[in-house]
């Protein structure tokens, strides 16, 4: 697991995810419009890189979800997130061309978040990517074709 995860939480992640199968089809938003390593940063990684604002209430340092990379079993949550990015003038300026990417989880541990948090989006998956493996997992993703509506 990522070396920046506290040891107590690393143990919890390993226990919770033991035996969990990887997902063969997941979706994520590439906020910058391309598939690159930073797209696969965990929430904590985005906090360290000043991509996300440090908000201890929203991103508690003692919860395992803060250290995961979020992916979804369906595309819809990603489309909704992109709509939010485009509605905000500030975020639209920061992320002018966000896209939905599609791929599979690997090289880490996974948990369907609702198994831990009954209030979570039922399509949300926490994915803890192994240290140094972001460049490997990004090869398993493509830009998802536009929805035909």
Language-model features, listed with the residues they occupy:
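ADP-ribose/NAD+-binding catalytic cleft of ART/PARP-like enzymes
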Residues: 1-63
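ADP-ribosyltransferase catalytic core
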Residues: 5, 52-132
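Generic secondary-structure transition motif, activating predominantly at the C-termini of alpha-helices
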Residues: 17, 86-89, 146
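Short, surface-exposed beta-strand/loop "edge" segments at domain boundaries and coil↔beta transitions
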Residues: 32-42, 107-113, 136
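Active-site or metal-binding loop neighborhoods of secreted/extracellular toxin and effector enzymes
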Residues: 121-149
């Amino acid at each position: 697991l990522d070396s920046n995860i506290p040891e107590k939480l690393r143990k919890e992640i390993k226990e919770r995810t033991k035996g969990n199968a990887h997902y063969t089809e997941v979706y994520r938003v590439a906020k910058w419009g391309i598939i690159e390593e930073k797209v696969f940063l965990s929430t904590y990684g985005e906090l360290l890189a000043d991509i996300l604002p440090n908000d201890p209430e929203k991103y508690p340092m003692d919860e395992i979800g803060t250290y995961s990379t979020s992916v979804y079993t369906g595309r819809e949550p990603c489309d909704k997130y992109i709509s939010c990015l485009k509605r905000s003038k500030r975020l639209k300026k920061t992320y002018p061309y966000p896209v939905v990417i599609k791929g599979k989880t690997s090289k880490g541990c996974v948990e369907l978040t609702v198994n831990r948090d009954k209030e979570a989006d039922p399509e949300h998956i926490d994915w803890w990517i192994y240290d140094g493996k972001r460049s490997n997992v990004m090869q398993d993703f493509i830009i998802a074709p536009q929805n035909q509506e």
